[in-house]
Amino acid sequence: MTDSSPAASPSSLKIYFRLLGYVRPYISLFLISIVGFLIFASTQPMLGYILKYFVDGLSNPEAVLFPTVPYLRDLQLLQAVPLLIILIAAWQGLGSYLGNYFLAKVSLGLVHDLRVQLFNNLLVLPNRYFDKHNSGHLISRITFNVTMVTGAATDAIKVVIREGMTVIFLFASLLFMNWKLTLVMVAILPLIAVMVRTASKKFRKQSKKIQLAMGDVTHVASETIQGYRVVRSFGGEAYEEKRFLDASQGNTDKQLRMTRTGAIYTPLLQLVIYSAMAILMFLVLYLRGDASAGDMVAYITLAGLLPKPIRQLSEVSSTIQKGVAGAESIFEQLDVEPEVDTGTVERDSVSGRLDVRNLSFTYPGTERQVLDDISFSVEPGQMVALVGRSGSGKSTLANLIPRFYHHDKGEILIDGVEVEQYKLLNLRRHIAQVTQHVTLFSDTVANNIAYGDLAGAPREDIEKAARDAYAMDFIAQLPEGLDTQVGENGVLLSGGQRQRLAIARALLKNAPLLILDEATSALDTESERHIQAALDQVMKGRTTLVIAHRLSTIEKADLILVMDQGRIVERGTHDDLLAQNGYYARLNAMGLDAPAEDIA
């Protein structure tokens, strides 16, 4: 993942307003919270006025507080001040509850919506996006970055609204009491604004670095956990310890830099505010005039209440910039154009005829042509095998048929219709695919077979698919049979067992086109014998594209395409190609059962 340049980065305000756009579904709750914070903020000046009455009451406790108000004209300061303090506290508590609770509902709902949208977005992004971004950074966005957004959407909004309104109420009261003295406080606002702006830029820049560093930590941990067998088998513990230590230390250093910025910035801001307070107190004493002691105490009290909300408003800049940096990376992903689907054709069924005409392909962002002028045809029910060394383009060709990538030139037709013209979901319903990299989910055996569109399939159909894949023999020995949990990515199963479940999933789909990408490469000899028998049966009536390096699979193909450097260099049946004594014959002489890197 790369950083956007500062010049290209959208402004913090624009990002934050976009983030707040997610508040719209909760606008009524948001308005209630604002009313609550208004109530809370209004109580701050009241405390200053209470002190005024208290000080004035020291010299005349029997003075009447509301001489012109009916029913209250006999209420003396002696009774009024304690009563008002209790009422103000209750009023403040009500405001605090309404503000905090309803804003929390808004903020948590906002973050939930954002997290769900981010995850759903991952499901529709094109394959090339996953090719360019490692899984650690993608996971970090959903976990760590969204957590940063939570801070900006909860604590930050609360502080901005509550403390911002408090500052407004206090300034309004100070202006009302003595506008000339209040101008002294106003004079420092430009300096405070400059300090906040400078610190905000630093906080945002550092926050982006922290989130990238956290993505590195997640990536290293994820790779090590997923590949723990390789780590232990090859003695990689020390290497992985060093790699994780470096990633974690980098994240720690960046966190400390941000903490240091805040540790310097906050005391400097406090020094400016309290310097203004010192000047203000001098002027209050020097220019007392005819004001009473209560007036002076009230004014100083209200002025003394200002530094706390101003300081909190300045400190919230760090939280906001963390959230803005997190939101920027989230919106960067959300703004990526999803997988393009311009197709209009939908068919309930297809016969499975496959025609590839003059197909060429280059991966986006690269210059090397992976496929060059590929042409062949497969009749319904036929089996075609792709053979060639690693990197010859076999898997790329297989991935273009279900439109995991969009081809540059040429055509791929299913039943005479270009695959780009099919609606994406409809196209993929007609294709079943099994690869050497089996993906199982942390769920039951049955749910892994009946996955996605297959969910809800009758139990007997699931059992039949498992039997046809020769998986029922080991499933029957599991503690709960089909209802046994397989663990993360099927960790509780052997490689052959995992592969058979993947094949059972493809069998249950019952699609007319079948793509087997090294589908038996992870199986032992006994397992392969069972699977091969099952595949022989299931391939009847289905168009099958097989990428394989085992002779037992290839020799039964109706057509073998021999690929090298993205081109078809030979084609024909097994016997025909051997008779030609060419490239395929040399591969066969090397042993088609050799390791995949030699021939696949």
Swiss-Prot record:
Compartments, record wording: Cell inner membrane
EC number: 7.5.2.6
Gene Ontology CC: one annotated term: plasma membrane
GO molecular function: ABC-type oligopeptide transporter activity; ATP binding; ATP hydrolysis activity; ATPase-coupled lipid transmembrane transporter activity
Job description of the protein: Involved in lipopolysaccharide (LPS) biosynthesis. Translocates lipid A-core from the inner to the outer leaflet of the inner membrane. Transmembrane domains (TMD) form a pore in the inner membrane and the ATP-binding domain (NBD) is responsible for energy generation.
Domain ABC transporter: 354-590
Membrane-related topology note: Multi-pass membrane protein
Domain of life: Bacteria
Protein name: ATP-dependent lipid A-core flippase
Spans through the membrane: 27-47, 83-103, 174-194, 267-287
Catalytic activity reported: ATP + H2O + lipid A-core oligosaccharideSide 1 = ADP + phosphate + lipid A-core oligosaccharideSide 2
Listed CDD domains: ABC_6TM_MsbA_like (cd18552)
Pfam family, one: ABC_membrane
EC class: translocase
Keywords: ATP-binding, Cell inner membrane, Cell membrane, Lipid transport, Membrane, Nucleotide-binding, Translocase, Transmembrane, Transmembrane helix, Transport
Residues binding ATP, per UniProt: 388-395
Entry note about domains: In MsbA the ATP-binding domain (NBD) and the transmembrane domain (TMD) are fused.
UniProt record similarity statement: Belongs to the ABC transporter superfamily. Lipid exporter (TC 3.A.1.106) family.
